[in-house]
Amino acid sequence: MAGTRKSNRREEILQALAQMLESTEGASRITTVKLAKQVGVSEAALYRHFPSKARMFEGLIEFIEEALMSRINRILDEEKDTLERIRLVLQLILVFSERNPGLTRILSGHALMFENERLRDRINQLFERIETQLRQILRERKLREGKSFPVDEKILAAQLLGQVEGSLNRFVRSDFKYQPTENFDAYWALLSAQIK
């Protein structure tokens, strides 16, 4: 029973942190004092569940990684057409971002500016993993469909992911007014026409 309460409290702390990142407070540095107040516990109680604020952010990063990478793997298992795979992966990231604005502050690096460098490295590693997946999808086109792209797969993957990162940054910069999926179909039509 105590383990379940501890697990629930950990989740409650992470949810409160994500909510704070989504609010106007997320535009500035979040302190453990503010977070403890939001959760309704003492600052010491936070540290019973997490040894540091960096570990709290790591908990959210782990959630982001698991959510995105597991869904990307599902896309790769279920879809075989290269362009459709790419479209679904890009759309997945944008939809995830739109549904989780507070977590988008982490993905964009905005929430991590004044935090431990290790956290920024984790986000960079996540984007490198996604870019590697995109490169692999692009390379497999030659094997699956007998077609290649007019541009090197490495350059193309970086460009595709860069477009997504730009949408995430715009979403954060606008205080979540410009939805990442807004005009996605037109955006995809433009991109896919260039890489067919």
Swiss-Prot record:
It is found in: Cytoplasm, Nucleoid. Residues 65-142 form a coiled coil. The keyword Coiled coil applies. GO terms for cellular component: bacterial nucleoid; cytoplasm. Residues 31-50 bind DNA. GO terms for molecular function: DNA-binding transcription factor activity; transcription cis-regulatory region binding. Residues 7-68 form the HTH tetR-type domain. InterPro entries: Homeodomain-like_sf, HTH-type_TetR-like_transc_reg, HTH_TetR, NO_SlmA, SlmA-like_C, Tet_transcr_reg_TetR-rel_C_sf. Belongs to the nucleoid occlusion factor SlmA family. Required for nucleoid occlusion (NO) phenomenon, which prevents Z-ring formation and cell division over the nucleoid. Acts as a DNA-associated cell division inhibitor that binds simultaneously chromosomal DNA and FtsZ, and disrupts the assembly of FtsZ polymers. SlmA-DNA-binding sequences (SBS) are dispersed on non-Ter regions of the chromosome, preventing FtsZ polymerization at these regions. This is Nucleoid occlusion factor SlmA. The lineage of its organism: Bacteria, Pseudomonadati, Pseudomonadota, Gammaproteobacteria, Vibrionales.
